[in-house]
């Protein structure tokens, strides 16, 4: 059986490929995973916030310290093509030759929120490989920003000063899942005002959310961000218990629906809607009872 190891990237890549594509033997890999306390750090936020640049800066810092770091870069997938649209991040190209940095892209494969069960499984394979840190970067589309909170031990929401017009949206949505806000490109006009507004909003919560300003392209603020990550990881929290329950729920949903044939569903539905007495809820009850 393949074993995941942070020092054998070839073997690790093979194990991840088997799991990602549900190839024969992948269940044995998952069932044989050993628990490790490696923190999974979710990095999310809107497109253009500089998430890949921030990841690159974190990798530079940790790799220089001899830390082993893995990155799962989540890419969107066309519903008509299961291939990844973005591929490996160009901005992280300099990291690929480092012996202690492992980067893998993962297509979302039509998961409505941008994250899939495969994200959970592959992150657990990486955790079992004993990396020091695991970064999961999403494209920040749909509900992936919220769903990553169900995967990551620490969720960093990356924003830029230009997001000031959307501050109310931030208040109602991302405020609920952020363990810290990272105001990237903080050398731009309006960055201080934006960061202060975020701080005021975060202070309305029972536990205020830290706001950390960075200029990732110049590595400014990275040490402060890493200090927060290390502090947060060592702090007692009920989040880990909630995380494992959320993961179990997603994995159970996937297992229970694995036998359903989506193409057959579409075909049967296309025929059923032609009937004048069509009722979607009756159709679902009838269809699931025979599946």
Labelled PLM ranges:
Residues 105-106, 157-160, 182-185, 213-215:
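Conserved beta-strand segments of the P-loop GTPase G domain that flank and frequently precede/overlap
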Residues 177-180, 186-234:
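Canonical P-loop GTPase G-domain recognition
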Residues 50, 54, 221:
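Conserved glycine(s) of the Walker
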Residues 12-14, 213, 224-291:
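Long, well-ordered amphipathic alpha-helical subdomains in the mid-to-C-terminal portions
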Residues 124-131, 143-162, 172-182:
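Inter-motif core of Ras-like GTPase G domains
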Residues 67, 99, 151-154, 176-179, ...:
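Short glycine-/polar-rich loops that comprise or flank the Walker A/P-loop
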Residues 2-41, 46-49, 58-144, 154, ...:
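Nucleotide-state-sensitive switch-loop elements of NTP-binding domains
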Residues 112-116, 120, 142-145, 149, ...:
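Amphipathic alpha-helical transducer elements in NTP-driven molecular machines
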């Amino acid at each position: 059986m393949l074993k995941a190891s942070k020092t054998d990237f070839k073997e690790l890549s093979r194990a991840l490929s088997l799991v990602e594509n549900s190839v024969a033997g992948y269940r044995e890999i998952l069932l044989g995973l050993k628990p490790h306390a490696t923190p999974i750090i979710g990095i999310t936020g809107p497109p253009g916030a500089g998430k890949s640049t921030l990841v690159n800066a974190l990798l530079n810092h940790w790799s220089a310290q001899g830390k082993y770091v893995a990155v799962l870069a989540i890419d969107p997938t066309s519903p008509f093509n299961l291939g990844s649209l973005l591929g490996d991040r160009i901005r992280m190209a300099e990291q690929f030759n480092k012996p202690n940095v492992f980067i893998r892209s993962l297509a979302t494969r039509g998961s409505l929120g941008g994250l899939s069960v495969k994200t959970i499984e592959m992150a657990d394979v990486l955790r079992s490989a004993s990396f020091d840190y695991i970064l999961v970067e999403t494209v920040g589309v749909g509900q992936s920003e919220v769903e990553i909170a169900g995967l990551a031990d620490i969720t960093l929401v990356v924003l830029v000063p230009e997001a000031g017009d959307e501050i109310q949206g931030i208040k109602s949505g991302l405020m609920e899942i952020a363990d810290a806000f990272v105001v990237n490109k903080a050398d731009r006009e309006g960055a201080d005002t934006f960061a202060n507004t975020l701080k005021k909003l975060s202070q309305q919560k029972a536990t205020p959310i830290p706001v950390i300003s960075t200029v990732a392209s110049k590595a400014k603020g990275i040490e402060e961000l890493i200090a927060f990550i290390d502090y947060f990881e060592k702090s007692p929290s009920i989040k880990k218990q909630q995380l494992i329950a959320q993961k179990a729920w997603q994995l159970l949903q996937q297992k229970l629906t694995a036998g359903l044939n989506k193409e057959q569903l579409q075909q049967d539905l296309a025929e059923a809607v032609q009937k004048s007495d069509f009722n979607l809820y009756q159709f679902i009850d009838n269809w699931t009872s025979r599946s």
